[in-house]
Amino acid sequence: MGTVVYKDIEGGFYAIDGDNGSRYDPINLPESFRKDGLRVKVTARRKMDAMSLHMYGAIVEVVNIAAQ
């Protein structure tokens, strides 16, 4: 479980703050889930071969996502 958050840095991007304190930088967050404050349940895969300018959290590929 976590919350979608919009970060207004580096041109702006959406991330997910996990309830456990972890932060995630999804590379493929669906447009319909790009809503600041949206509670979500996510299954994701860590992308070890990817880089990001955001430097916000673990880079992940969303496998499954649902609003809560």
Spans of features found by a protein language model:
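Beta-strand/loop nucleic-acid-binding surfaces
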Residues: 21-34
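Flexible glycine-rich surface loops and low-complexity tracts that mediate binding to linear polymers
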Residues: 37-51
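Structural detector for short beta-strands of small beta-barrel domains
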Residues: 1-10, 44, 66
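OB-fold/S1-family single-stranded nucleic acid-binding modules
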Residues: 50-68
